[in-house]
Amino acid sequence: MTSHYGVGDGYHGRIAADGSRFDAYGLTTAHRWMPFGTKLRITNPSNGRSVVVRVTDRGPFVPGRVLDLSYGAFRTIADPGQGVTRVCFERI
């Protein structure tokens, strides 16, 4: 499962864990342990849409979630109103 962050939660414009400025509309993700800069292809199996993101932050810290996508990345593959969606991902 993945969720999204950055719009309406105060994170847009803050410094991410890798030292970059977080852009909620960019194509980034948070992951608990993957090295910063790692590129991942995220695919929503329910609609086939995919997006390539870069790991820039740490999290999510909610049980059952493996990624926390930026709002911009999430809206590429799913409706942000859903809040969460199932995804498949691969390192590229």
For each feature predicted by the language model, list its residue ranges.
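Secreted/periplasmic proteins
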Residues: 1-92
